[in-house]
């Protein structure tokens, strides 16, 4: 794995256009918000497509009685994008937990967004969906099948350390094997600060303790607080 600190080391430059597909609100914050902040800080066009509203999440920190989780998570995503400097984004309404059952619709969305935005690079989760979530796996599969040369497909992944951790209860697999990263992208302090703020914007998904400066246990354990991980297809 090569440790890098600049976009040029990922073959992304001022002529690049980066289109990002994520399954749920907060996936961008967890896995690539530092990278996204690096893109916008360098004035590289970026568009974020979130396929679902995340309405099936079992995490409801700070959700007031009577509040609609999907609507709340859409607002959280908007706030996260503002923090990251992303002005071009869409939050779609593919059913949370049912993305794999919508292959034709999702592939049409991916194709349409590629035709509209004309990216040089497409970003999505690696084929095992990081931790086996069926929506993650489905989106990665559909993106991988639609994206063809000359567009570059860059997978977000995790360091090998994480593979030894227990599989999430949301996983549809008993064993997961995320792609080994080619690149460890080190984040500047300002990018880490933006990542923390982006995570905190998703208030229903991350309790204050989870994102307190004294804790961040998950992100320290997965080495995702100060670095993010990528592999080209």
Tell where the protein language model's regions lie, with residue ranges.
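Active-site rim/loop-helix segments in enzyme catalytic domains that contact anionic ligands
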Residues: 1-118, 145
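Metal-dependent de-N-acetylase/amidase catalytic core
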Residues: 2-19, 101-233
């Amino acid at each position: 794995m090569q440790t890098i600190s600049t976009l040029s080391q990922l073959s992304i430059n001022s002529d690049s256009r980066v289109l990002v597909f994520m399954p749920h609100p907060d996936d961008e914050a967890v896995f690539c918000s530092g990278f996204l902040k690096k893109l916008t800080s360098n004035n590289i066009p970026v568009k974020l497509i979130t396929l679902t509203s995340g309405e099936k999440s079992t995490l409801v920190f700070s959700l007031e009685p009577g509040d609609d989780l999907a609507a709340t998570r859409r607002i959280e995503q908007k706030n996260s994008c503002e923090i990251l400097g992303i002005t071009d984004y869409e939050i779609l309404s593919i059913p949370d937990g049912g993305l794999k059952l919508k292959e034709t619709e999702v592939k049409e969305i991916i194709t349409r967004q590629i035709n509209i935005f004309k990216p040089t690079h497409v970003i999505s989760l690696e084929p095992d969906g990081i931790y086996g979530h069926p929506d993650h796996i489905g989106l990665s599969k559909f993106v991988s099948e639609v994206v063809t040369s000359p567009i570059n497909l860059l997978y977000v992944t995790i360091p090998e350390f994480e593979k030894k951790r227990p599989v999430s209860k949301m996983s549809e697999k008993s064993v997961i094997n995320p792609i080994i990263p080619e690149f460890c992208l080190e984040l500047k302090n300002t990018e880490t600060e933006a990542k923390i703020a982006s995570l905190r914007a998703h208030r229903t998904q991350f309790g204050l303790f989870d994102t307190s400066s004294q804790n961040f246990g998950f992100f320290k354990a997965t080495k995702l607080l100060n670095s993010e991980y990528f592999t080209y297809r």
